[in-house]
Regions:
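Switch I (effector-binding) loop of TRAFAC-class P-loop GTPase G-domains
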Residues: 61-90
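A charged amphipathic helix-loop-strand protein-protein interaction module that recurs
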Residues: 262-263, 293-348
């Protein structure tokens, strides 16, 4: 009887298992690398020299008072800082000097270095600039470079120093500037589409990820060019009021990982304690990370109350620092409670290592639930 070679099924199974394990390990390594990139976001802060970029950065992240920013000098080339936010998110913040020579360098020799792997572009316009056409021409070149190298980046435009415009005409001036910037943005996108016609068409939906589309997707060189003039966000800002906190809270909101989980848990907490409203602040900057409002609280007529609270708490923190002699970046308080008879009750307390929470209770509710 002839002998036949039997296939070595044990060896084949072992080889398949080893290959599967290798593939799994590679996938996990890639996922970890992706998550690491998500948690370290490259943020470009750009605009003409003197537009107020470094001032707003110092107020938000370095606890400067508005009046203290007068002693800040002009930014030379790129001022790179790593801002830790909520513990696990690092903002790789590139504060780019706005002098003409630097701008030309960013758009030529350093083009790929500056505009690659960008998560967010924050562009600042000085509303009182005397050379608007030149400012817009530079902006068009910046947007073209961004779309070329990081076409999935989010764009935020801040129309700054709005306090210098008369209150009666402020809204009209802002609306006209917004329309102009959107039109110029469309022109910049059209330039790149003309150069790369193969990348025209609507953008596909980004892959799901923690914290929304921004946190779950990274720029792809082959993705279609988006309609930035539609998706971009524009804000009127000033260092002298709460408008700066509104703009920067919106920027941070798009960068926070697991934001949907935070919002869900905050809503559950609000319902459980029968609150009117809850705000979650980042500990150092006091930017609003997330918020929840009850159906009754939605009737509050003050739409800017969230950024107002950021501004008030930051000012109170500065006051505590002044009278206690502690550094501005130090933790100035753990909690406080405020009551107005039976009509209003609110408390602010340290919530986690990196956050504070503000809770407003409905009229008549006892506010003794604030931690002691």
């Amino acid at each position: 009887m002839a002998d036949y070679d039997q296939p070595n099924t044990g060896a084949s199974t072992a080889a398949a298992a080893a290959a599967a394990a290798t593939a799994t390990a590679a996938a996990q390594a890639a996922a970890q690398a992706q998550l690491k990139k998500v948690k370290k976001q490259k943020v470009l802060l750009m605009g003409k020299s003197g537009s107020g970029k470094s001032s707003m950065r110092s107020i938000i992240f370095s606890n400067y008072l508005a009046r203290d920013t007068r002693r800040l000098g002009a930014t030379i080339d790129i001022d790179l800082s790593h801002v830790k936010f909520l513990g696990n998110l690092t903002l790789n913040l590139w504060d780019c000097g706005g002098q003409e020579a630097f701008m030309e360098n960013y758009l030529s020799q350093q083009r790929a270095h500056v505009f690659s792997n960008v998560g967010v572009l924050i562009y600042v316009f000085d509303i009182e600039s005397r050379d608007v056409d030149r400012d817009l021409a530079t902006y068009v070149n910046i947007i073209s470079a961004l779309v070329q190298y990081s076409r999935e980046a989010k764009v935020f435009v801040l129309i700054h120093k709005m306090d210098l415009i008369q209150p009666m005409t402020r809204e009209d001036v802002f609306d006209r500037r917004v329309a102009l910037v959107r039109r110029k943005t469309a022109e910049a996108v059209a330039i790149v589409r003309k150069q790369k016609p193969e990348l025209t068409g609507p953008s596909p939906p980004p892959p799901p990820g923690p914290g929304g589309a921004m946190a779950g997707s990274l720029p792809s060189p082959d993705s279609p060019i988006p309609d930035l003039e539609v998706s971009m966000q524009l804000f009127a800002t000033s260092i002298w009021d709460q408008s700066l906190y509104k703009a920067w809270a919106s920027i941070i909101h798009d960068l926070v990982p697991n934001l949907s989980v935070i919002e869900t848990q905050l809503a559950s907490l609000g319902v459980a304690i029968d609150a009117d409203e809850i705000l979650l602040f980042e500990r150092t900057s006091f930017l609003v990370v997330s918020k929840w409002t009850s159906p009754e609280g939605e009737s509050n007529p003050y739409g800017d109350r969230f950024e107002r609270m950021s501004n008030i708490l930051k000012a109170w923190k500065h006051t505590c620092s002044k009278f206690t002699g502690t550094p501005r970046n130090a933790e100035q308080f753990s909690d406080f409670e405020y009551k107005m008879g039976a009509n209003f009750s609110m408390f602010v307390t340290k919530f986690t290592t990196n956050t504070y929470i503000l809770v407003c209770m409905p009229p008549g509710e006892a506010s003794s639930i604030a931690p002691s």
